[in-house]
Amino acid sequence: MSKEIIAKKAAIVEEVFEKFQSASSVVVVDYRGLTVEEVTDLRKQLREAGVEMRVIKNTFLKRAADKAGYEGLDDTFSGPTAVAFGGEDITAPARIMAKFAEDHEALEIKGGMIEGKIASLEEINALAKLPNRDGLLSMLLSVLQAPVRNFAYAVKAVADSKDEDAA
């Protein structure tokens, strides 16, 4: 093999390694059986959420994963493999892939990584059920506001009852 080809392959492995390092979450899927239209639709949904999906040779994935410290993923990187690298929203790759897999039986989630740790299929599915960051923040805010709101209603009710008694 020529040195030029080896250098290109090493560059691809390095690029995938950097994506593994920078991604908040990674979801690995088997896309066998999806039409070009369906894959294009999936890529569009992922892109809108700030997630990059790539089809990468399994040997490159294995080498990059080993370099990143994700050992034991050899079973995950077999057959046709696409990888979704998450950005700021840690739940986006899992959520979008799981929803797409519900609608398209051909898409199979194999596993992935969450914040630098290897995740099982169950963990990926649990992550997919969580709302995005904005949804979680709004839930937290409503929980924090509830006691204050209830106290305000109680004070208003007491004030209203005193006004009625005075009248």
From Swiss-Prot:
Q: Which residues form a coiled coil?
A: none
Superkingdom? Bacteria
Signal peptide bounds? none
Query: What GO molecular function annotations does the UniProt record carry, in alphabetical order?
Result: large ribosomal subunit rRNA binding; structural constituent of ribosome
Output one GO BP term: translation
Alphabetical list of Gene3D superfamilies matching this protein? 3.30.70.1730, 6.10.250.290
Q: State if RNA-binding is listed as a keyword.
A: yes
Q: CDD domains in the record, alphabetically?
A: Ribosomal_L10
- Keywords from the UniProt entry: Ribonucleoprotein, Ribosomal protein, RNA-binding, rRNA-binding
Q: Which GO terms describe its cellular component?
A: large ribosomal subunit
- The record lists the membrane-crossing segments as none
Family, similarity comment:
Belongs to the universal ribosomal protein uL10 family.
Query: Which PANTHER family does the entry link to?
Result: 39S RIBOSOMAL PROTEIN L10, MITOCHONDRIAL
Q: What does this protein do?
A: Forms part of the ribosomal stalk, playing a central role in the interaction of the ribosome with GTP-bound translation factors.
Assembly and oligomerization: Part of the ribosomal stalk of the 50S ribosomal subunit. The N-terminus interacts with L11 and the large rRNA to form the base of the stalk. The C-terminus forms an elongated spine to which L12 dimers bind in a sequential fashion forming a multimeric L10(L12)X complex.
State the protein's name. Large ribosomal subunit protein uL10
Q: Which organism is this entry from?
A: Ligilactobacillus salivarius (strain UCC118)
Q: What is the lineage of its organism?
A: Bacteria, Bacillati, Bacillota, Bacilli, Lactobacillales
Gene name on record?
Answer: rplJ
